[in-house]
Amino acid sequence: MYIEETTFIVQELVRKKNLLFPESNNKYVGLIHDSVHRCANVLRNTDALYHNFEHTALVTLCGQDIFVGKKIVDGGVSVEDWIHYTIALLFHDIGYVRNILKEDSGANQVVNIDGDTINVPPTCTDAHLTPYHVERSQLFLRERNWTQNIDLDLICAYVKNTEFPVPKNRLIENIDAKTIEMSRLVTSADLIGQLADPGYYRKIPALYYEFKETGADLRLGYSGPADLKTSYPAFFYNYVRPHISKALKYLNATNNGRSWVSNLNFHVFCEEHRAILSEEGMSLLQTISKKMAEERNFDNALHFILNNICDFQKWPVGHAYCRTKDANEYKMSPTNVWHIHKRTEAIDNFVAV
């Protein structure tokens, strides 16, 4: 499974590079291969319950769809921009793993550029390094040999900005506008890749026990995994959404990107309405969310949604309206999309009108 996952990520990154920059030919293919395998070889040894290679793979794939959207919407990016961005995604959480730095020794783990260390108790997992993993990730990158004119300072700047919660005093000075934006897109990919993961609910217990190991569960007021689930909407609106608006714009530019947005909205909506939705209702929402992510034809998607909602509610007739904004007012206009459970002459006459 490990080999299959690694091979898939390599193939997907090469495919994205060639799609985005067909003139680049085989440039960076070897570096992509080496980077993915280096990342996977380290992360497969972690005993952190959540921050593993699967999480990094999801963040990297989400980041690719964000980058594709940026190129479509704004343009102005190069294959060099892409490779630095992608390496940052691959290695943003590598610092969770113990004994990866030259000065790491047994239980003593380096936590900053000054060489300070902490002792990781034998009963703890790699999650114990959560407060230091961003700094350790940058140190790991700097200890490796890189070729092909890779700008390590740029990659480390991207990784540095994945620190979360985002510090109120975070300042990005003396950096050009593109670097600032790319740095923020790496952060967005980290957040969306986690929260829009189709398997996020299944992984919540793993994330909770990482929090518990560092005491973050108490600081956040969580008494169990269920608290992470119920607090999802508040966490999203208060801490995540302010930092991902640009990335959402780019994701909405492609079908693959919209699937991330759809999953994100689905998770938020479900937790906001869980108290009033039955299990069947939750299943219907998931079905609709999946259809919206896959369907290219809007009318087909609208027919599908209307039919399923009417069947679920046992409504014999349903009609879709289109809301448009005219000046400062919204107007509702009828469409040709109908759901009719059983046709009768009266209903046909009504539809005709």
Regions found by a protein language model. Give the residues of each.
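Histidine- and acidic-residue-rich, metal-dependent catalytic cores
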Residues: G63, A127-N169
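Non-catalytic interface/linker regions that flank or bridge core catalytic/transmembrane domains
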Residues: M1-A48
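Active-site flanking loop/helix segments enriched in acidic
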Residues: D34-L61, N119-D126
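Alpha-helical phosphate/pyrophosphate-handling elements in metalloenzyme active cores
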Residues: N45-H84
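Divalent metal-dependent phosphate-bond-processing catalytic cores, especially two-metal-ion Mg2+/Mn2+ enzymes
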Residues: M1-R15, L19, D65-E80, F91-K102, ...
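Short regulatory alpha-helical segment in sensory/regulatory domains of signaling proteins that mediates
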Residues: A48, S289-R296, I305-K314, C322-T324
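Signal-transmission linkers at sensory-effector interfaces
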Residues: K178, S278-N300, D311, M332
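GAF sensory/regulatory domain recognition
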Residues: N307-C310, H319-A352
